[in-house]
């Protein structure tokens, strides 16, 4: 076990005194790291995620290289879907492709439930390896939110408009709610197993829920999010982070959920979130594109985010979306160092 562990992010969420604003980056594991690219010359994404030693190495790299205050498990949000009967393939340059999309309630009924120890032991073994032997910062486990998972399962892959997903919601509520309930059950079991293996925080990625308006979110999504988070927290008192893209119109709905941290994309400032009445710890929210700019521009954009975060009092620095593959690793290291130095107290 690790002594003198850096629990800054957990202290921030609890409202305890910290020495600096904690920082981590979505998609910090992999992508922009040269060590990861070298691995990808030999191993596929599937190979890496199914070999705990390799996966733990990739997960741990950004903590060593960038000195982040948390690690996030290197996995894909599709991980729990294949064991329940979803024929999913990750295609380079496209993303998840589903070969048996959900169209009817019979398709939902064919889905099985997940047994994490039986179906995804490599996920749990990776977490145990990290938490028992190596990691000196909290590990973030994660899952895709029911809407985002369902959108892939219904559309058959990435979508711009989510027409099939919305069509099912509006014209076949029985199938929609059956799918939501099934995915909540899967997510609760998957997340609970991650926590029991050693994950100390959970992030729920609702990447595409911004496609819905407030009324539809309340009717078709919110009750299921409440059940998912509540059932996880009934089992374990674990902090939960919720993040989505282009969902500023849903901020007040999210603030009602039993989450601990609300992740902002780059379109909504910390001050704006406060003015909207958000009471949760805030996470974010540098535009990831800024990391491709010269350092003086990056620093200029970092300061107001950090100033607003310090004024708010409960802030975790992150990007407003994931790290782009083109971002230089040294830039991420400098950002992490700047956040720690600028917010030191």
UniProtKB/Swiss-Prot annotation:
Pathway: Porphyrin-containing compound metabolism; protoporphyrin-IX biosynthesis; coproporphyrinogen-III from 5-aminolevulinate: step 4/4. One of its GO terms (molecular function) is uroporphyrinogen decarboxylase activity. Its EC number is 4.1.1.37. Substrate binds at residues 27-31, 46, 76, 152, 207, 321. It catalyses: uroporphyrinogen III + 4 H(+) = coproporphyrinogen III + 4 CO2. GO terms for cellular component: cytosol. PANTHER family: METHYLTETRAHYDROFOLATE:HOMOCYSTEINE METHYLTRANSFERASE RELATED, UROPORPHYRINOGEN DECARBOXYLASE. Homodimer. Belongs to the uroporphyrinogen decarboxylase family. Catalyzes the decarboxylation of four acetate groups of uroporphyrinogen-III to yield coproporphyrinogen-III. This is Uroporphyrinogen decarboxylase.
């Amino acid at each position: 076990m690790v002594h003198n562990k850096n629990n800054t992010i957990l202290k921030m969420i609890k409202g305890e005194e910290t020495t600096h604003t904690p920082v981590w980056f979505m998609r910090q594991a992999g992508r922009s790291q040269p060590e990861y690219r070298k691995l990808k010359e030999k191993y596929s994404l599937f190979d890496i995620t199914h070999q705990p030693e390799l996966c733990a190495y990739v997960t741990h790299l950004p903590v060593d290289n960038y000195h982040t205050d948390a690690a996030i498990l290197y996995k894909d949000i599709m991980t729990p879907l294949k064991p329940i009967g979803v024929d999913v393939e990750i295609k380079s340059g496209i993303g998840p492709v589903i070969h048996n999309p959900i169209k009817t309630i019979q398709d939902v009924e064919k889905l099985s439930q997940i047994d994490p120890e039986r179906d995804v032991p490599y996920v749990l073994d990776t977490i145990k390896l990290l938490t028992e032997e190596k990691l000196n910062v909290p590990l973030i486990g994660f899952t895709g939110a029911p809407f985002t998972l369902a959108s892939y399962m219904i559309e058959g892959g990435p979508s711009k408009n989510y027409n099939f997903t919305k069509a099912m919601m509006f014209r076949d509520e029985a199938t929609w709610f059956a799918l939501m309930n099934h995915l909540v059950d899967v997510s609760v079991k998957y997340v609970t197993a991650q926590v029991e293996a050693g994950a100390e925080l959970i992030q729920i990625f609702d990447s595409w829920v911004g496609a819905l308006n407030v009324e539809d979110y309340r009717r078709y999504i919110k009750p299921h999010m409440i059940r998912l988070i509540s059932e996880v927290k009934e089992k374990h008192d674990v902090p939960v982070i919720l993040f989505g893209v282009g969902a500023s119109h849903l901020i007040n709905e999210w603030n009602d959920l039993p989450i601990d941290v609300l992740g902002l994309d780059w379109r909504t400032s910390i001050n704006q979130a406060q003015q909207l009445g958000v009471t949760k710890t805030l996470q974010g929210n540098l535009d990831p594109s800024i990391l491709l700019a010269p350092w003086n521009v990056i620093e200029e954009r970092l300061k107001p985010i950090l100033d607003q975060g310090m004024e708010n009092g409960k802030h975790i620095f992150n990007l407003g979306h994931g790290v782009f593959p083109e971002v230089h690793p040294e830039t991420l290291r400098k950002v992490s160092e700047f956040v720690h130095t600028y917010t030191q107290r």
